[in-house]
């Protein structure tokens, strides 16, 4: 028998709290390959920062490029003011050979030319270098340039390499060619040192891939958060000023190196390109209140302040005016630098808040909350007067139910689709705490990280569950819960924006399954393909609607229950197959109904409109796929995308069939005739 449902929308009953566009924000962090994928640089180990992992005297991703039998490679101290290493290449003229270094990369056609920057010094007999990009399969030189070496001392050089066509199995080479004039070998000849080599395509936008910027603009994010586990050991002054003078720093949260190229100034430029509000989380782990206050001053201070002067010296005269600041990222977790008790954090928070607001009293502060109310209770008792928002991180996966991949598939599916019920319970507990004391009622809630996370964020390979239509439907239903609680929840930050862990909704390249290794430059045949997961399209569908206030609605439909293997806090029986929320624009002229079919069968649905006069057609946005496991990849980047249809409105009623495990947005315009 065909499943049926009825949705009654009453536009005469409209909520009074406006839906904040920051609800649909996003999140960037230096985790695994997030920055490698987001930024436009094709090269790795640009400062020769990694150690010699091949035992050939070369740093990290670099490999020898020589046919000389006597060429020597070694890592030596970096150039003045630089960190990492410098790369020494010792060339013997009697070899009559070419000698240099190479690295696998992927490049696109660029007639304006990739920007090449490098530091070099050489013994006087080495007069020039060749830099080229080559198709490793055919040997075709896709572009080349000549660098004249002018000094035995360190000097910066710049050029452009025009690239004739796209090639995802390319190689960058920088070398002394065999055609170089000969010299008489001795202990001080044939010496070439290199330090900091970078390439950037001409279409980069503030160092970020143009494709990533374009896709992020389409998300209409409202707010962009800079945070994550790494921030608890992040010292902001190490990532400002000339990039070559920024130190290479170990990423204490995730291993490897922090990305020094995307610091405060680049983040603000990114936000301005997107026209979104920045949210910055400060380092309360290894950092100090004074350091956090100086960060506020760097962003917001005038030219009469020390940090304002420093910002201006770095090329940014006008203050950034960053309004939203977060103190503490998952400080309750033992994996976090600065992990502490609730009492310790509350006291620490007050010190940070007072220092930061001492610089700019107009900023809004977010305090690190927890899903465990004992933490929140102590935090609010000691620090509520110093905060504007309490934060929660709400990830949803099998661990909540004691399930794993051996649990029957349908049971796992139902568990994941119960995401909004878990969020409802978490929000309810915080709401009760806030309402329990008049000193707390000014507080709002910020969900600064959320997503499906099927398994713990540790080493794992296999199906990218977070990329599926199932995950998108769960995330959409969770967004519905955010909207239902928009009187309290004002900020949401989807985790993550690009690659990183499996949750990134914009994907660069075909790396997605290995949680541990991260990106290896040029390792695949599809390194330049940029596409969105189904959840990317959910975020796009929600954030680009004209939303003002929640409208009363009632849904009659079938239901399901979750057979959890462990006790659960929320009640997980008789859950509605359709998760629905209705909204009205501020001017009252547009009605938007978000509908998620959480069942595994199609549902014929009637939407009845009460108090909203319309005629003609409505617009139906649909995110569907062949089944719940449908996902996009580099070979089929648009297997699951949002489609738009016109549907008739007859007698204030819309009929539509909602496919299984799918997300729909019904948009209706008021008739004014």
Named regions from a protein language model:
Residues 198-206, 246-260, 278-286, 328-346, ...:
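The substrate-binding groove and active-site-proximal loops of carbohydrate-active enzymes
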Residues 170, 201-221, 267, 288-324, ...:
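An active-site-proximal structural segment forming one wall of the substrate-binding cleft
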Residues 1-260, 277, 287, 293, ...:
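Extracellular and organelle-lumenal recognition/adhesion modules and their flexible linkers in secreted
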Residues 30-31, 443-579, 589:
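Aromatic/acidic polysaccharide-binding cleft in carbohydrate-active enzymes
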Residues 172, 177-186, 190, 341-479, ...:
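Noncatalytic carbohydrate-binding groove/subsite architecture in carbohydrate-active enzymes
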Residues 558-573, 596-673:
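C-terminal beta-sandwich/jelly-roll accessory domains of carbohydrate-active enzymes
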Residues 26, 118, 220, 271, ...:
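Conserved, mostly hydrophobic/aromatic
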